[in-house]
Amino acid sequence: MANYLAQFQTIKNSCDRLVAAVEDVCDLWPTVKGLFEEHQPLKRAFLTNKTRNPVFVENLPVEFILTTDARLRSRFPQEQYLFWFREPYATIVLVTCEDLDEFKNILKPRLKLIVQNDEREWFIVFVSKAHPSNDQATKNVKKVYAKLEVDFSSKKRERCCKLDVHGPEGNFWEDLELKITECIRNTLDRRAQFYEDEIRKLSEQRFMPIWNFCNFFILKESLAFIFEMAHLHEDALREYDELELCYLETVNMPGKQRDFGGFDGEDDQAVLLKPGSKPLTQIVQDDSFREFEFRQYLFACQSRLLFKLNRPFEVASRGYSFVISFAKALTLHESVLPFCMREVWVITACLALIEATASHHHDGVVAPDIEKEFFRLQGDLYSLSRVKFMRLGYLIGYGTDIEKSPLNSACLSMLPWPKPAVWPSLPQDASSEVLEKEKTILQATSRTKHFGIQRKALPLEPSVLLRVANRRRASLSTGNIPEMFDGRPSFTEGSGLEASPRTPSSLKVQAPPMSRTNSSPGNFESPLDRPMRLAEIFVAAEHALRLTISDHDLLKTLSSIQDFENKYLNLTKGAAENYHRSWWKRHGVVLDGEIAAVCFKHGKYDLAANSYEKVCALYAGEGWQDLLAEVLPNLAQCQKILDDQAGYMSSCVRLLSLDKGLFSSKERQAFQSEVVTLAHSEMKNPVPLDVSSLITFSGNTGPPLQLCDGDPGNLSVTVWSGFPDDITLDSLSLTLVATNNTDEGGQALKSSAATVLNPGRNTITFALPPQKPGSYVLGVVTGQIGRLRFRSHSFSKGGPADSDDFMSYEKPTRPILKVSKPRALVDLAAAVSSALLINEAQWIGIIVRPIAYSLKGAILHIDTGPGLKIEDSYGIEMERYMDADCDTGASKAEVFVEDSPVSSKRDSEVLNLCDGKIVFSDWASNVSSILWVPVRALSEKLARGSSSVTPLKQDILEGMRTVALKLEFGVHHNQIFERTIAAHFTDPFDVTTRVANKCNDGTLVLQVMLHSLVKANLIVLDVWLDLQDGFIHGQNDGRPTSTFFPLVVSPGSRAAVVFSICLDKSMSSEGKDLQLPESILNIKYGIHGDRAAGAHRPVDADHSETDTEGRDLVFKSAIVLQRPVLDPCLTVGFLPLPSDGLRVGKLITMQWRVERLKELKESEAVEQQHDEVLYEVNANSENWMIAGRKRGHVSLSEEQGSRVVISILCVPLVAGYVRPPQLGLPNVEEANVSSNPSGPHLVCVLPPLLSSSYCLPVK
């Protein structure tokens, strides 16, 4: 089967479509050929793939070939079996007939003979030539076609279709497409099954000696080609994948040694996308193929199918993996391959993949993640070719022009040198080139970095090239001549990405003779020739590469340093651009740094600065300070050349922020010097700069500063300076940020004067104005150095005191300041709640309680309200306040005295009131104290007594006085507490009178009851009564009938005195005015009380304490004596209630009878209308509802004994004992009215009766 390999490849190259055979029985093909070809390709075809699943194929091309064509006739049976993929997949039989007898006798037997082959997939196309106007011909055609369908079609399968040449086409072409598709599907399934069976048989023998890979390949690729022609690209790709796996399993079978290949012309150029670059007959070897060409052929077939599937991403992914794995295979055979064959092949392969996949890729067609991954692979391909290209450039002497950056050093120092069997020798006529190379090497000088930074150049080689090249020369042995080491230390050979085990000795036996290789020892002057110099090694490698490289474009890029830089720049830009569009944007930024180095070399400082900024931002963000130290000086130099003062200053600060071990002290001082010089130079505009990595700050150790709402303070902050020397800050500000609301921003605290920061730790104190309540953390430190405005938002951990350079950039969660919410810092309250004596100098107590806050230097403003004045002539006493409530809450509300630095020995002090305010003493700053202020409540109103029948109600507000207090305290008296306290002043006694008895001689016994109104012992020394007109004393002196003085009245108790009085009958009411309208009760008394409890002995500022004790007090009260109730003018009587009683909700009539007992004198009358009496009914609205008139006039004759009844309708509202409504006569004095009953009384109101509507019968 392997003998047919050439014919197989020829047939495969000539077939690109499925074939449908046309059996033209009636010479109809010339007529219908054009119509058939117009309807190609098949628009909608459903085929079956290898797994027997239906697959929709769009636009399936089919080629129609007559069965009489030589392409189908000139084949031997063995060829048909071997190349079955090119056989027809469908047979179309073209017939026409208009005579039924002709069909039966001639056409039908012929058709039976044609379709009797079971292997064919056939159907019949009946072509009607009858014109629509010829009815007879049309009828005959229909009869013939009907008979044709009966004879050749069945229920399982319809094998006939009709094409009307002159009539409408109808759905013929759809029917034709379905029938062709059905035939192709059946044929495809049968042939695929045949190939699978044959392939399975061969696969089972692949580890046997009789195994022949060529036979397996022909069958496998035939099946793949069938699927490819049927546009089943997925199945075809799967076949090629299986073919590749099988080849890799069998290519290196032990006992079979095959040539690797790669010795032909242009083999250095990868043919990953050109499957027909070499005929298969040229790469066949025994029963298999050479690995070098065949693996590329398989990948080219796979990539062709992937491009048809519109998967350039998969081509790039597979291509990158293939390049890596194939490069390892090249490494295994490197000793027999041309010099640097691996590097050249990798470069061409990567560039070919990049060009092909980029041309097939369209943005936005695939998903975004796949698109990004595609660009990542493009970047990888560019990077791989870039590294290999740099290796070639270094081998020919361009290493001095390659930037010794961390990236280039990492790539090249891990990439091994080429390992030919013998290093290329120097041509005899290359002396001039060697001289030129030596001159270039001597003139090459490393670029001096800015700030005079001295750095050891990063290596670009895995080991010393001079040693490696000389060691691989055939006539030298390692270490014979010291010159080969060139005075350098010995390095271990590196192993890069493509490093692999040593080449087997069997592969180093003999290389096939070829004119291109430079691996031969060459001509030497003696058996032991001298070692090659470095320039000679470069020249020898360059000549060897000229023989290896067949690509003129690649060869041109290595011909001069300018072309090399251009190609290097293009590869770097391609990699960077693709990485920027992928996930690996950091790789693109790093490559931007390599582009920046080239731009800097050629004076394009603006482009270099832009790229360097991206690289520095990446390195800083990742924390790669070693790499940042390599690139940042280059950026600073570009900015200085471009006169970018802000950028240059920022770069200097960033250089200072790096680890101290990366630069020497002298270099760091140079950085600081540049910053200070620029800051104080004549810059156009102030430069804002973030120095967060250089200046950090933290709060001091310990608890946060505690302040109350509205209090100022001093805040100490630790600032860490990363400058190597002292630096003076013109201004420094610190921002505090509230933890509960960070959106508002913080308040800036400014330092009062210039600040000098020493290297390391510094403690700075800021004046803290009052802050809002909440917790505060450090926000931002800002300041200014000359024209430089700096800002830092980094925080230090606040390490141990001895680590002055310990800095961190983590934001602390511990607050530095806590301002408590508004709370009570002090409490002012009245010391006494009971009443004091009115019109007498009394001590009023004010309790001052500090609540966990110092009152040192506090000022209390005292302002009395109306009716109250302070006795200025007497000092204000201040005492320590110690009561039970205060002691209990001291642990929560007060600061202990021993915690205060103020001495606690003093317990009292006399303070002077100045301009209505007093200043607290220091001893009272942290303890509760009480202030005794002498005041006097003024009242010109004379106290009035009341009758026991109608007692007067005491008006509490009448004796109330207020004192407005305002306390200013705090460090700057910024805290203000205001409160108004009330004090109750009253008379010592409440006087009540009643007539106890009336003697037969007209003498009245008047009982005067004295009720103590204060919490003190009142001592009654003497009492006398000044009677009003119309009354005289039974005794001439006006004293009580019995005297038991001094009489002590305890707090809240009662006492009584009795007077004997008579009516003054000699007094005439006509023509005489009243001289004393009311009686005056005089009481001389003393008082024993405590000012801490209430009323007490008055304060007299004009006398000494001894005089005050001897001075008695006099209390006067006015009492009204009514005319005796036994001699009234009118009487009001409450008539009895109904016998059934009162009930809630029941309407009743209340009645009062008014009767005139005697005529009313003119002097006793209130109005002149004596025949009318004004009445008024008073009732509690909560207990009674009045239905009638509450107020009105009734007629009452002036004659003695006349009477009238007043009736009022009302409804009781509540049950129980309540006071009934009362009838009063407003225009008649109480002395002229007698009531029955005489005083208030109660009536019983029953609950309402139960209603039957709400009752349930009891069963």
From Swiss-Prot:
Lyase found in the keyword field: no
In UniProt terms, what function does this protein have? Answer: Specific subunit of the TRAPP II complex, a highly conserved vesicle tethering complex that is required for the proper transport of proteins in post-Golgi trafficking pathways to the growing cell plate in mitotic active cells. Required for the polarized and selective transport of PIN2, but not PIN1, to the plasma membrane. Not required for ER-to-Golgi as well as biosynthetic and endocytic vacuolar transport.
Q: How does it assemble?
A: Part of the multisubunit TRAPP (transport protein particle) II complex composed of BET3, BET5, TRS20, TRS23, TRS31, TRS33, TRS65, TRS85, TRS120 and TRS130.
Q: Which UniProt keywords apply?
A: Acetylation, Endosome, Golgi apparatus, Transport
Record protein name field: Trafficking protein particle complex II-specific subunit 130 homolog
What is stated as this protein's family in its record? Belongs to the TMEM1 family.
Residues found modified as N-acetylalanine: 2
Annotated Gene Ontology cellular component terms: early endosome; trans-Golgi network; TRAPPII protein complex
Q: Which gene encodes it?
A: TRS130
Q: Where is this region: Disordered?
A: 479-526
InterPro entries linked to this entry = TRAPP_II_complex_TRAPPC10_C, TRAPPC10/Trs130, TRAPPC10/Trs130_N
Q: Which Pfam families match?
A: TRAPPC10 (PF12584), TRAPPC10_1st (PF23036)
Localization per record: Golgi apparatus, trans-Golgi network; Early endosome
Query: Null phenotype?
Result: Cytokinesis-defective and seedling-lethal phenotype.
Q: Which GO terms describe its biological process?
A: cell plate assembly; cytokinesis by cell plate formation; Golgi vesicle transport
